[in-house]
Amino acid sequence: MSCILGCNSNTKNTYLLNDILHDSKEPIIKKVLSDLNSHEVQILLTRINRDSLGVPKFERHTFQVNSEHYFYPASTVKFPVAILALQKIRKLQSQGIPIKADTPFKILYSENVIKRTDSTHPKNNLTIAHLIKKIFLVSDNMAYNYLFDFIGRDDANKAIHNIGITNFNLSHKFSDSDSDLENKNRTPRFIFFNQKGDTIYNQAPITSNQKIKNTHLDGVLKGKGYVKDGTTIDESMDFSEKNYASIAALNQILERIIFPKVFSRNEQFNIEPEDYFFLRYWMSRTPNEVTIPFYDRETFFDSYCKFFIYGDKKGEMTNNTRIYNKVGLAYGTTTDLAYVKDRNGIEFFLTATILTNKNEIFNDNKYEYEQLGIPFLAALGREIYQFEKNKN
């Protein structure tokens, strides 16, 4: 058991998380603890202690956290991509380009327009700001794909590494209907235009030259088989060319958005105060609280993208507790990274992942998300919240 060093942190080598887990009366936690090896659980808790001036100091505690052991981050990587899209907008503004996050744009492959409108936008516009909202509300894959291309893969990785975050590499987009038009190492063209329809920024296709391979990590070969084109292949699935984001890296990104001033200037994202407010607002909303964009309340319930505390419940979230987070769910891996804060001053960061793939076959869509993955993270969130509440 170890604590991860970080900026303005008070590190303690304790068994806090181990004790919380083993003292838990939650059946789902006991079940996972009985088979830790197959579930590849990693948990990072950051307790927040404020001084007399209200300045936060971080006290980190870990359970099985290992940045050298690979887990598939799934949609959690949409969070840094949302941040970097806003950062790129600010960079373009600094170059004199009259562009904003709500400037409409269109996307072209080989000069053919493949995307220009968004039916969930009140004006039917495709904008960076609206795509970010969709990422946090319902984890929209296409929204991530468009932002990924807008930034460029190599530039995205460089931007994260430049602020001191390691053990992080983006390599791919998610499944989308434009895949037949896509060159994986070359983005489409982006054209931003004003209300008159005049072009204000024309971004040529970006070519990515980095070769992403996670072969140095443990656990990149997973399971005993995987499904490809409807056929089961009897060998481990290779994740070495998939996206990679360690528990520590995800947590560090979130800390920089919630408490940017805790970090030195060269460790912060290069965005403006209103960008921080925008990100915090939308990452803490639920589909039920929002009318634009509107999502069906039955399909996209309040805890649809909130796994900690409420993931195994529907219709029970209240304004008393805000969860600023991004979840990931794919290849049997369930992950959440969150800053939790309630009206009584209880606050903490919690990042955790669990693998639930009983048959050890990947890509067969037979995973225990609802039975085990999400309920475990929900129970874990409740245990940590209750622990912090008792301490207060």
Which residues are covered by each model-predicted region?
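Short, Lys/Arg-enriched charge-dense amphipathic segments
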Residues: 61-72, 118-132, 165-179, 189-203, ...
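Active-site-adjacent loops and short helices of periplasmic peptidoglycan-processing enzymes
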Residues: 11-186
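Residue-level detector of conserved, well-ordered beta-strand and adjacent loop positions
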Residues: 8, 106, 351
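Short low-complexity stretches enriched in small and charged residues
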Residues: 59-62, 101-103, 114, 204-211, ...
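Mid-domain, small-residue-enriched loop/turn segments at the edges of structured enzyme/sensor domains
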Residues: 127, 132, 138-272
